[in-house]
Amino acid sequence: MALRYFSHLPEELKEKIMNEHLKEIKKKEFLENVIKAACAVFEGLTKKESVEEDDILRFSGFLEGLSAYYAEATKKKCLVRWKKSVAINLKWRVMEEMHYKLYGFADMEDLYCSELGFPNYGEDDVAYHDGAIVNCKQLEVVFDDLGIEFMSIVIDRGSIKIEL
């Protein structure tokens, strides 16, 4: 129906509408390329057993920004899902940094306790969600039961994938 009215618009207005549409497409393509390039850089970190503190801070900031972007774009809750193959040292330190940014130093003991008593670590992927390190399968069941739509950024050894 909108196309029927579009054909009756003056040429200048048609051109302006088309240019705006093309700008949006180009902006989206540019952003996707930037995300792919950044993911490629951080994929190298997922292969390492030992990572510098600066890399942890950058990776944590990247994952926070990426999950916020996709949560807003898809209108879904976005989980950063860590596969078993990623070095424990890397994933714990990134989750610790995320926790620190949310809650500050005063609440860090709770995260340390969760790490020590983590349930079913060998059986499933983990995610940091609302102040705790959780089993992804259990969290997905809860989200499904509550009708919460979610998507995942999956961190595996040597890859970062977006699962919508």
Swiss-Prot record:
It comes from the Viruses. Keywords: Host-virus interaction. A motif (LXCXE motif, interaction with host RBR) lies at residues 111-115. Residues 9-22 are annotated as: Binding to host SKP1 protein. Interacts with host SKP1. Interacts (via LXCXE domain) with host retinoblastoma-related protein 1 (RBR1). Interacts (via LXCXE domain) with retinoblastoma-related proteins (RBR). Belongs to the nanovirus Clink protein family. Interacts with and disrupts the function of host retinoblastoma-related proteins RBR, which are key regulators of the cell cycle. Induces transcriptional activation of E2F-regulated S-phase and G2/M-phase-specific genes. Inactivation of the ability of RBR to arrest the cell cycle leads to the stimulation of viral DNA replication. This is Cell cycle link protein. It comes from Subterranean clover stunt virus (strain F). The gene is DNA-C.
